[in-house]
Amino acid sequence: MNKIDKLPDDAVKIINSEDYVDKKGNIYSFDNRYGHSKDLFIREQTISNGYKYCNVRYCINGKYKNITKKVNKIVATAFIPNPDNLPIVMHKNNNKLDNRVENLQWGTVSP
């Protein structure tokens, strides 16, 4: 993880998580594993099947657990309304590694 000084202005907290996401698709985490200061880091992202994935720390039933999620879904859930409850996140430019909010939209799979 890369340490940084502060969250970007457009970063928002991920629902049910202690982590944050910005409009560029970066995931941020405060690390206090050693009980000292809470250092801020950009979380590492891995690539699988052409998509970026990231471990996010979620609170489930009062307990914290790291869950691997697609970065595009994290960004879209945080910034793009989905009133029709569409199931998938699509990349407008077909580049699955480009998770900027302006490149994402909710959609469905064609039959």
Positions of predicted regions on the chain:
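Conserved recognition-core residues within compact binding domains
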Residues: M1-I88, N95-P111
